[in-house]
A protein has these predicted regions:
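Generic structural signal for secondary-structure transition and capping sites
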Residues: 43, 51-52, 75-79
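Short, hydrophobic secondary-structure boundary micro-motifs
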Residues: 45-46, 56, 82
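Broad hydrophobic/π-residue packing in well-ordered secondary structure
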Residues: 26, 37, 55, 77-78, ...
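Intrinsically disordered, low-complexity polar/acidic regions
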Residues: 55-56, 87
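Extended hydrophobic
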Residues: 62-108
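Amphipathic alpha-helical effector-binding/dimerization core
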Residues: 1-49
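Substrate-recognition "cap/lid" segment bordering the active-site pocket of phosphatases
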Residues: 57-61
Length: 108
């Protein structure tokens, strides 16, 4: 996942900048939402090739737990993560798809 822009509210201050930064697909709401749009075999192949290194103490790195969250996103049409890529951050994301199936990005 690559973040293009990040807008902060009037009440919150960001202490980390994500714009232009790459984040692991398995640990972000946008990444999981996009993986949920793929067939299970393709998503599993991407997950298998990923370095499952925690970004925070709350990052899921167990492949079965990550697969379960991807399945939830597939069922619900969106993904949620809580403090898995940045502490103090809760993110909800939905994939942006091309031709009704190929994910090309995500809205967080």
């Amino acid at each position: 996942t690559i973040y293009a822009i990040r807008l902060q509210s009037k009440r919150e201050t960001f202490y980390a900048t994500l714009a232009g930064r790459r984040m692991p697909t398995f640990a972000t709401a946008g990444g999981r939402a996009m993986l949920a749009c793929l067939d299970e075999r393709h998503a599993d192949d991407i997950l298998r090739r990923s370095r499952l290194v925690p970004l925070t103490p709350r990052t899921l790195v167990d492949p079965d737990q990550i697969r379960a969250r991807i399945a939830e996103a597939r069922r619900d049409g969106y993904a949620c993560v809580q403090e898995e890529s940045l502490m103090g951050e809760i993110v909800v994301a939905a994939a942006v798809v091309k031709d009704r199936s190929m994910p090309v990005g995500a809205i967080h």
